[in-house]
């Protein structure tokens, strides 16, 4: 998909906050932030998953499409996602996990990002919960240093691309959330 806008500055000139999109932020003072930069109707259920993972323990940020239709025009590629509130929250975080959606019903979470230790820990926890994972899909590598998930204090993070069938299954959402939480707890306490 080709983005309609090249960055947030361009998007905000043409789209109206609280009419076309909204921004949800919870800063609980954690060193970990969970983000859904394509939430709401842009990539359905990603906001719900991010908030489910964050609970009241981790910070979260969700950029959510709320238009009646054509929410895809609000999509900013992750390496162009520069909304200032997201940048501020993430820049103060040691660990960043971005929740994304991919098409298809493969029953798979595709992991990307530059934080290899956290990515491997999340992958292990997902597999323990019976969730299929892939760490090598060419479309979901998340290695661009400008990717929003790689903009934390340590300049590395993780992104999860979750297939539609998993996002539509409440039980699977719970398992994915538990797996990410368990991985974060292990990494934070190491």
Regions found by a protein language model. Name each.
Residues 1-190:
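N-terminal catalytic or cofactor-binding beta/alpha core of small enzyme domains
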